[in-house]
Amino acid sequence: SSAASDVYKRQLTGGAMMGAMMKNDADILTVQIKGNGPIGSMTVTANPKGEVKGFVGNPQVMLPLKDGKLDIADAVGIGVLSVIKDIGLKEPYVGDTILITSEIADDLTYYFANSEQVPSSVGLGVLMNKDNTVEQAGGFIIQLMPGATDEFIDKLEARIKEIKSVTAMLEEGMTPEQILEHILGDMELDILDTIPTKFYCNCSKDRVSKAVISVGKEEIQKMIDDGEPIEVNCHFCNSHYTFTVDELKEMYDCCTR
């Protein structure tokens, strides 16, 4: 639905930018939003290479327009935003914050300030076609570096308050570079690198089989007793994986519990 597409693309865009901020190629960042609204929970996973994937709990949610616009906050509802950073340590870092507006950008800004103690401004927007498909999505994350002067901070805050919405900038055909130039105005801008983004799912039959094994011997035995192949679907890319009874027996033998 258009509501699910709008909310999901905002989260995908934010997640892609946050993933690009991770340091090592093997690092993985996940942004989860769990609200009590009709859209259900949403998950986005990204890495520093610009690869991103995600899924929506209820992609078919239909909501009436509010003042002629989609009401993102109503779709998401009240809930929690979680950011999970897997950087190869024994346990991943997990930061949880409440959803303050449920409009994604404000919630990510709040997360950065409260969980990472980094003053930030996040803007996100989605440009929809008349047939409710997404034409493009975009956004920005601006963070202060240590040593920023009060004068610079005041100037930046004033500028952010007066800029157009990201959706309006996309509608005007602005590129990411032009969006940054528009936001920063006469403040100095140096572009150090650009990273193309793309949807990428790393699921495979082997990875899915490990997930099946993780349910334990008792559950796998029930599947074997049914005497029929099982089909497992990937939430992220909707790929289908079929396991025969013989394959289930092999997975049963691999179970440790």
Question: What residues fall within each predicted segment?
Answer:
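Glycine-rich loop at the start of a catalytic domain that most often binds anionic cofactors/ligands
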Residues: G40-K49
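Predominant activation on well-ordered alpha-helical scaffold segments within soluble catalytic domains
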Residues: L12-A16, A105-T109, S209
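Hydrophobic alpha-helical segments and helix pairs
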Residues: F55-Q117
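Cys/His-clustered metal-coordination modules, chiefly Zn-binding fingers
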Residues: K161-R257
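DNA polymerase sliding clamps and clamp-related checkpoint/processivity subunits
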Residues: G50-G54
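Short, small-residue-biased leader/transition segments that mark boundaries at the very start
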Residues: A3-Y8
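Short helix/strand-capping turn motifs
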Residues: P92-G95, A105-M187, I191
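N-terminal low-complexity or amphipathic/hydrophobic leaders
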Residues: K9-P38
